């Protein structure tokens, strides 16, 4: 009975390994046997082996893991794919549906949340005494610190602001 339990335990470990690593059952069995059925050791060996294999550009046939949280994508390959995508996008004309789907329209305004220049912003009430200050672009800019202003500076600024009211 213990032999059957041992075989069952091994089969369960093989199945778990296949799910965790995304490889074939025969490869999982070989790795587990080589690691004396130590699951973590076999899993570590599998991922070290897959890193070596990808560095050697897949010289021998091997089952690569699926893209799971435990197995991030191969970043050099992903970067190469993105650079190819960028190159192919620049070769297309701007009227193609693919480039239109990936690019903003020609009249795209990054300040879409700001109000139009000739309309009052929505967040200020129309009767606000300061609303007119947002539409006149000739009012003087404040100078800081106040000590650096020439004499009469504060009076000039106040007179200019009073003149706008």
Curated annotation (Swiss-Prot):
Name of the protein in its database record: UBA-like domain-containing protein 2-B
Pfam families found in the cross-reference section: UBA_8
The encoding gene: ubald2-b
Disulfide bonds: none
InterPro entries found in the cross-reference section: UBA-like_sf (IPR009060), UBA_8 (IPR054109), UBALD1/2 (IPR039310)
Organism of derivation: Xenopus laevis
Family listed: Belongs to the UBALD family.
Stretches the record annotates as Disordered: 119-165
């Amino acid at each position: 009975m213990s032999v059957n339990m041992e075989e069952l335990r091994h089969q369960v470990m093989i199945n778990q390994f296949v799910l965790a690593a995304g490889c074939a059952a025969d490869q999982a069995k070989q790795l587990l046997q080589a690691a004396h059925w130590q699951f973590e050791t076999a899993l570590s060996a599998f991922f070290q082996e897959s890193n070596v294999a990808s560095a050697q550009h897949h010289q021998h046939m091997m089952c690569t893991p699926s893209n799971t949280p435990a197995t991030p994508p191969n970043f050099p390959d992903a970067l190469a794919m993105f650079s190819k995508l960028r190159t192919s996008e620049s070769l297309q004309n701007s009227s193609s549906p693919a480039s239109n789907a990936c690019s903003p329209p020609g009249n795209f305004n990054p300040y879409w949340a700001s109000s139009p220049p000739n309309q009052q912003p929505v967040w200020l009430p129309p009767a606000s005494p300061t609303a007119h200050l947002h539409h006149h672009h000739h009012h003087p800019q404040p100078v800081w610190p106040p000590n650096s202003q020439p004499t009469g500076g504060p009076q000039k600024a106040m007179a200019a602001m009073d003149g706008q009211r």
